[in-house]
Amino acid sequence: MSVILPRNRPSRPLRFDMIFHQPAAPASLAFRLRFPLAALSLAATLFASAAVAQTQPAAAVVAQEPAQSQSQSQLQPQPQPQPQPQPQPQPSVQQGQTFEEEIIPQRYANNAKIDAFIADMVARHDFDANALHALFARVSYSATAAKLVMPAPSPAVKNWRVYQSRFLDAVRVNAGVKFWRANQGTLQRASTEFGVPPEVIVGIIGVETIYGRYMGNFRTLDALTTLAFDYPNTPNRDARQATFRKNLEDFLVWTRDSQLDPTGVLGSYTGAVGIPQFLPSSIRDYAVDYDGNGHIDLRASQADAIGSVANYLKQHGWETGRPVVWNIAPDTGSQGVAQAAADGRPEPHWVLSQLLRAGLVLDEPSVNIASEASTPVTVVDLPTPGRATEYKLGLQNFYVLTRYNRSFFYALAVYQLGERVKAQMEASGALTPSPADAATGSPAAQPPSE
């Protein structure tokens, strides 16, 4: 039996208690939901930026063993608190395929784990128990979501150049220019209010969903319930289930408070929603009503998406007016120091002066070394098979980008896509270079090097 999943939420938001009058499907039936892959949002390459080329799971990036070098003994990183786990990278599905979602209806009716969850929601958030029981009786187990969160049998080989070309392609750049032109006033307002440059906001939204083109067709309630209570048997199962349980809780509170039908919200198979692909916990914590209509809609309102991304970055420590990365000189000594200090940690934990004393040289003529000597940095490694690994220094703002998705590749792709779009805006006369960009020769006026 084939069922067509609705592509959009109902045009009129429903009250939480309006959704329980439809008969549920027989419990014995299993369905396959069939979609063209493009309509499904490429199922992974585009959700949460799909950090496929990185082998580290986003929930627990493993530090790489630094290569040995004579300068290594001089490098003593400062201890830093460990960042919170983030959603795992998404596996990819090839374009042109037909995608089927396999679901099992009524899996969560008369379920002891669901009953305990409902009791908790009633006690802590004043939900109606009967309404929640009726709701979960209509929730389906998504076997597809459970399969897609499984780690690959063998880790993919990291390839920065392939990843970079995927997210800095002409489609995204041209769509970014169109998005920027259509939202120039809102982007500038967000930049002024939150201190985040328009190009960074544009870069994130472009990498995440190509400016709302691919936001996901999984029913969010099904995906979150499946992953909260039936996460696959992996080593990190308990931690992942706890994360998705919290997001399911926040999803129900958010949809109730926003008068949205929880069965009508669509998103990625990990529960990320809308143009910026926010998980429900992030929606509750960081999303803002930026078009002033009284409610937050990350799927339909580009203004809400822009303001929410800017607020997320600000709340995670974005430093206004500061760089994202610095280039490292290509000489053998500098590259050797970078290799030795590249330990996979995204938070800035080396003091710049330590690396300089070890022999690293910056390729940044406009940087005042004396005033930046105490700046904390991290070494960003960008491996490509068959080529020498590229290295950059990441500053606090680079780390903030990894808080959106814990991947070096992701953070640099966001930065470079934003710079590429900004360069095209300036070249077309739609954007005037700032005096600071013109004076320093910053990459704002030039596409990032490949």
Short names for language-model regions:
Residues M1-L33:
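N-terminal secretory signal peptides that target proteins for export/translocation
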Residues A30-S49:
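Bacterial N-terminal signal peptides
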Residues Q54-A182, Q188-S191:
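An acidic, Gly/Ser/Thr/Pro-rich helix-cap/linker signature
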Residues F127-F136, P197-G203, P262-G267, N293-I296, ...:
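Surface-exposed patches in mature extracellular/periplasmic domains of secreted proteins
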Residues N130-A156, I205-T209, F218-T226, I328-Q335:
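Acidic helix-start/capping segments at beta-turn-to-alpha-helix junctions
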Residues A156-S308:
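Acidic/His-rich structured neighborhood in mature extracellular/periplasmic domains
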Residues D261-V377, P385-G386:
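Flexible, glycine-rich surface segments
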Residues I328-E450:
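C-terminal soluble interaction/assembly domains
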